[in-house]
């Protein structure tokens, strides 16, 4: 299985330059492709899946057509269930609190 990670950096809109008084957040999205959902019996009016449990990229460079084909079942990556995990990390810069 090959994972793809997308990182987005967000800052507040009124922040043209970075200062210590504003907060920004970091959003990390990890995309994973699960079981194959291709209906192999659609041509005859039935429903049958091949049982492939997760996408494994074929031998190919990232971004080529070969990398979009599953090595286990031979289907295109779009037939596999897409799972997105999103993690938001706040980079908050707040003054330390006093124990009153």
Curated annotation (Swiss-Prot):
One GO cellular component term, please give it.
Answer: cytoplasm
Zn finger regions (ZF-HD dimerization-type) covering which residues? 33-83
Q: Which GO terms describe its molecular function?
A: DNA binding; protein homodimerization activity; zinc ion binding
Q: Does the keyword Cell wall biogenesis/degradation apply?
A: no
Show the segment(s) annotated as Disordered: 1-26
InterPro entries, per database record: ZF_HD_homeobox_Cys/His_dimer (IPR006456)
GO BP term (any one): floral meristem determinacy
The domain of life is Eukaryota
Q: Does the keyword Membrane apply?
A: no
Tissue and organ expression note = Mostly expressed in stems, flowers and siliques, and, to a lower extent, in inflorescence.
Q: Where in the cell is it found?
A: Cytoplasm
PANTHER family to which the protein is assigned, alphabetical = MINI ZINC FINGER PROTEIN 2, ZINC-FINGER HOMEODOMAIN PROTEIN 2
Oligomer and partners = Homo- and heterodimers. Interacts with ZHD1, ZHD3, ZHD5, ZHD8, ZHD10 and ZHD13.
Q: What name appears for this protein in its UniProt entry?
A: Mini zinc finger protein 2
């Amino acid at each position: 299985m090959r994972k793809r990670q997308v990182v987005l950096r967000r800052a507040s809109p009124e922040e043209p330059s970075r200062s210590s008084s504003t907060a920004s957040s970091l959003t990390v999205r990890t995309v994973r492709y699960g079981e194959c959902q291709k209906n192999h019996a659609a041509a005859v009016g039935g429903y049958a899946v091949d049982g492939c449990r997760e996408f494994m990229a074929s031998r190919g460079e990232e971004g080529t057509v070969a990398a979009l084909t599953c090595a286990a079942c031979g289907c295109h990556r779009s037939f596999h269930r897409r799972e997105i995990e999103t993690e938001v990390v706040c980079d908050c810069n707040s003054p330390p609190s006093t124990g009153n």
